Amino acid sequence: MKKENQAALILEGGGNRGVFTAGVLDYLMEQNTEFSYVTGVSAGACNAVDFVSKQRGRTRQCMILEDKEYSYISMGNMIKNRSLFDMDMLFDRYPNEIFPFDFDTYFQSNTECELVVTNCNTGEAEYLSEKEDRQKLMNICRASSSLPVVSPMVELDGEMYLDGGIADSIPVIHAMKKGYRKNVVILTRNYGYRKEKPGKSKALYVAAFREYPNLLNTLLNRYRNYNRTLDLIEKWEKEGHIFVIRPEMEPVGRAERDEEKLAAFYQHGYDLMKEKITDMETYLKQDNED
């Protein structure tokens, strides 16, 4: 089914590189820009729910912390909870206490929002949505953001899940299969970036996931799938079929904690979207062609 007059927003992950996406989305929220469909992966899932709940500035607050007491990245946490990131802080204390998430606005939104997770048994991507249960929504976000090896698996309805980026890092093809003809893609890497074949990480994956052969296969081939998707994105972008926003400065690292670097990358996203808003609006208004 074609959705001629509707547009999709696709958000890549990348840990704290998601602060770039936060800048892009904060500007879009200032302009009251809405999309019929939003999908996000890993950190992009967190961006996605904040966009649908219309909480301008929330993702920035979560990523650029003024109070170090609420930091969610530490090696101590890796030893204590087998996770580099404090997932309880991120998906329990943040939304319920520290940076309250507006569940009511999110649940009442007409925007369809799907968050990408990877099923550990099948090794395939699943696209989950939740518009009623607060805890389940945050658990889906947690699963979508749970990196292999450095985060434990997350159980949802009896199945085990990990980071959505393992199986589908940039779900633009999924959005197209759902019928969306206008797709705005927010990437967190520069033009021309490609992933390399697993090196030392291969041994870690084999040791950690030998009981999950389908997941292991997806992990070892992730670079191929990711690079193939980027090849298509660059082709479709050149042909005018999709609209892409990506960093034009050096991205920060996945676990970057330097406030100045994070703030600069956030501002870059904001300024870039402001610069390109007219081009995006023109793209969205263009007639669709078969």
Model region roles, listed by residue range:
Residues 1-41, 49-290:
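Patatin-like phospholipase
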